[in-house]
Amino acid sequence: MLVTTTERIPGQEYEVLGECFGVTTQSRDIISNFGAGLKNLVGGEIKGYTKMLTTSRQEAIDRLKEEAAAMGADAVVMMRFDSGSIASDMQSVVAYGTAVKFIEKIRVRPLT
């Protein structure tokens, strides 16, 4: 399934099926929380959180593709992410976009 952040797919006509979403919520583990507390003191990347967000984004895209496929879509255009914290130890990531179905182009032979 093609997923793109652009509005158009060059050379492809399609009909819009509607909006589609992929959502995931992940909790931070105790070790990541402890490591984050230490990093707050000395600064630097919190690799446990980075890994969690990377995994969450991929899971959200996978779920977006599943929903689009269930709608009969061939692709998703204008894909975007949104994310936010829930309480102090959970992260929610949403991938959303527009599900589209390709329209077959009819090739007309020139008259001779």
From Swiss-Prot:
It comes from the Bacteria. Gene3D superfamilies: Hypothetical protein apc22750. Chain B (3.30.110.70). InterPro entries: UPF0145_dom_sf (IPR035439), UPF0145_YbjQ-like (IPR002765). It holds the Pfam family YbjQ_1. PANTHER family: UPF0145 PROTEIN SCO3412 (PTHR34068:SF2), UPF0145 PROTEIN YBJQ (PTHR34068). Belongs to the UPF0145 family. This is UPF0145 protein LAF_1635. The lineage of its organism: Bacteria, Bacillati, Bacillota, Bacilli, Lactobacillales.
